[in-house]
Amino acid sequence: MSSCKTTLSEMVGSVTKDRGTINVKARTRSSNVTFKPPVTHDMVRSLFDPTLKKSLLEKCIALAIISNFFICYWVFQRFGLQFTKYFFLVQYLFWRIAYNLGIGLVLHYQSHYETLTNCAKTHAIFSKIPHNKDANSNFSTNSNSFSEKFWNFIRKFCQYEIRSKMPKEYDLFAYPEEINVWLIFRQFVDLILMQDFVTYIIYVYLSIPYSWVQIFNWRSLLGVILILFNIWVKLDAHRVVKDYAWYWGDFFFLEESELIFDGVFNISPHPMYSIGYLGYYGLSLICNDYKVLLVSVFGHYSQFLFLKYVENPHIERTYGDGTDSDSQMNSRIDDLISKENYDYSRPLINMGLSFNNFNKLRFTDYFTIGTVAALMLGTIMNARFINLNYLFITVFVTKLVSWLFISTILYKQSQSKWFTRLFLENGYTQVYSYEQWQFIYNYYLVLTYTLMIIYTGLQIWSNFSNINNSQLIFGLILVALQTWCDKETRLAISDFGWFYGDFFLSNYISTRKLTSQGIYRYLNHPEAVLGVVGVWGTVLMTNFAVTNIILAVLWTLTNFILVKFIETPHVNKIYGKTKRVSGVGKTLLGLKPLRQVSDIVNRIENIIIKSLVDESKNSNGGAELLPKNYQDNKEWNILIQEAMDSVATRLSPYCELKIENEQIETNFVLPTPVTLNWKMPIELYNGDDWIGLYKVIDTRADREKTRVGSGGHWSATSKDSYMNHGLRHKESVTEIKATEKYVQGKVTFDTSLLYFENGIYEFRYHSGNSHKVLLISTPFEISLPVLNTTTPELFEKDLTEFLTKVNVLKDGKFRPLGNKFFGMDSLKQLIKNSIGVELSSEYMRRVNGDAHVISHRAWDIKQTLDSLA
């Protein structure tokens, strides 16, 4: 892997082994000539180690580096501090441009066209005899043109450079031009990089405050930590990639090795370009000068441009883009959703200050952008009149309430697919519900961050005189870091992952494997670590305002809770509990002290778990001592009931209220009617006696008087009574006869009198036209049927048959007027009881109660939810 090599490590040197001590093979890029690379050394050893041979250029480079300090002293004495600072600032800018633009252009053309290699071959720079001369010609004396003299000089100089630099056993002509060109190229890289580093260090040194009070503070301590970390990054990076990649060797020839991800390369993407520049910011902290910080930001940013336009394209052409089929899973899911749903369009996404996937025909996009525009314009036009305290409360409440709303949706969706069910039961599709969620989530992010930006901006504006410029810039850097994290996260997991697609469309996931590509190679939950650094950046920008600290804490806590208690359990449920160790985790666990601490914690955890398990076993051991008869509650209840019935019969031999076949059947599945046999002594019977049907939970323990209404679920005991109450309550009387001692009869409760709710019920025999209870039946169960859901056709058939028996189906449509006890809610419960899904009343009204549409819609919803399981 090619890597940048600037700043601190060049002054420290490498503690790693020389690359030549390892048996490495290489080959040229175009001609595929195989060779063994020679022994080379890192930059600092090559220039300053007196035990190594030095070429002319290396001596000149070392002299140029040392001369900078003498020049600094002379200019300082003659022109003063400010002029010297700007003098070396201009030098640094020159060398930085020479690095990023100069070396960048050279490497660009070398990568695409092998320009340097072809130039060396064309002009025979590393050949014994030039290609255009025969063996008997004298190249140095017979070359009269300026061009030939020039290339003859270059040829001799380059060969002299390599011979004076390399060991005696190095055969210049035995190696291909690529390796020799690379050795010469290294010399110019040494000059530019060392000058870039030294001029920057001198500029920083001249910017350090003279007051000891300004130097010895928390900023300097943090700065030293960053510098030391930067040194470790450089040393570890050189240990991993050696100077083959340190000097962009793969632009010239290829070693037989793969891209390496070890050590510091497990901590951060492109560590030499990212965390490899933390020393810049450490020095800026020590100086406490925003001008130094701006220069450092310029140097770092230009390095990212070098990475983007030079190194990354070359790495992708040489090694591939580093993605595999698993890493592209989410992207393929996005494509699949678009392919299978023609009305689906990619969601609007806010990234930094821009919006992606804007759809001019989608109203919600205008609503989102309009909200931002209205808030911004309103703030600008009324900035003087805005009360910051009220605005703070608004930001806090908006963030908290909207987060609770978002978290509730995700939690309930994870537990029961609640959000998807809500839309399915109202006639919408699974993907449509996902689109609505995408809008809600993006609007939540846009709204909360817009309010945060407005509040922070007004805070800075109202206290600008007290704002530290360096803190302001550092805060903006943290904001940029969070924006970068968001973009890298979305790049790694695509729109599907960004919008928690596995909560809503888990049936689209073909491979149950978490991605470890991109930023997820280094962090398991980047949004939890780097996803709030920008908010803490606002704390810096506002000079540690208490209100901004409160908002930053709120952002951090809500983010942590969402990841820890909602996202992580759901991910474990979908992808399994396979523990994914991040690159940072691997590196930290590789450090011996931390590994020892981790082992101690694991041992303590195992001891605690073992003790809890042993205690649980001891506490549960008493259950085994209970007699078996006491553990069978059902059998015990049956014995109690039989004993009570026996006592009641002896006390009143002519009082009886029994359900027909109650010994055989205690659970009646609708629409099965329930027939009741009753018997009453002749002296107690009244023609107005009636029997009501009640839920046991409603009547409770009141056995003498019924204190709840029957709601129409009652029947007379005689056909001659209750003439003004319609036929329904008399037609249920199927038999009645009297003897000298008692009156007995039969009453049948069919679908016109029964409840259409699952539950435990009982019959109550009431005396006369009152609610005084004479007899109570044995409790029994009524349940809705489970219709055949094998196919949508069978489900429709069973549904229509049931509705016909209940007398609520006419012309294939549901008509609840036929049975006042079977309404829309009963139909919803019937469908839910059979197929496990629920349709909304609004949807069933919208389709005119069509049994065919309703049954097939419920079937489709079941198929969708089953695929999400």
From Swiss-Prot:
InterPro entries from the UniProt entry: Phopholipid_MeTrfase, Phosphatid-EA_MeTrfase_fun
Keyword check for S-adenosyl-L-methionine: yes
Entry's transmembrane regions: 56-76, 87-107, 188-208, 213-233, 259-279, 292-310, 363-383, 390-410, 440-460, 464-484, 535-555
GO cellular component: endoplasmic reticulum membrane
EC number in record: 2.1.1.17
Pathway: Phospholipid metabolism; phosphatidylcholine biosynthesis
GO-annotated molecular function: phosphatidylethanolamine N-methyltransferase activity
Lumenal side: 2-55, 108-187, 234-258, 311-362, 411-439, 485-534
Subcellular location: Endoplasmic reticulum membrane
Topological region Cytoplasmic: 77-86, 209-212, 280-291, 384-389, 461-463, 556-869
Highest taxon, organism lineage: Eukaryota
Modified residues (N-acetylserine): 2
Lipoprotein is among the record's keywords: no
Catalytic reactions on record: a 1,2-diacyl-sn-glycero-3-phosphoethanolamine + S-adenosyl-L-methionine = a 1,2-diacyl-sn-glycero-3-phospho-N-methylethanolamine + S-adenosyl-L-homocysteine + H(+)
Cited PANTHER family: PHOSPHATIDYLETHANOLAMINE N-METHYLTRANSFERASE
Family: Belongs to the class VI-like SAM-binding methyltransferase superfamily. CHO2 family.
Described purpose of this protein according to its UniProt entry: Catalyzes the first step of the methylation pathway of phosphatidylcholine biosynthesis, the SAM-dependent methylation of phosphatidylethanolamine (PE) to phosphatidylmonomethylethanolamine (PMME).
Name of the molecule in the record: Phosphatidylethanolamine N-methyltransferase
Gene: CHO2
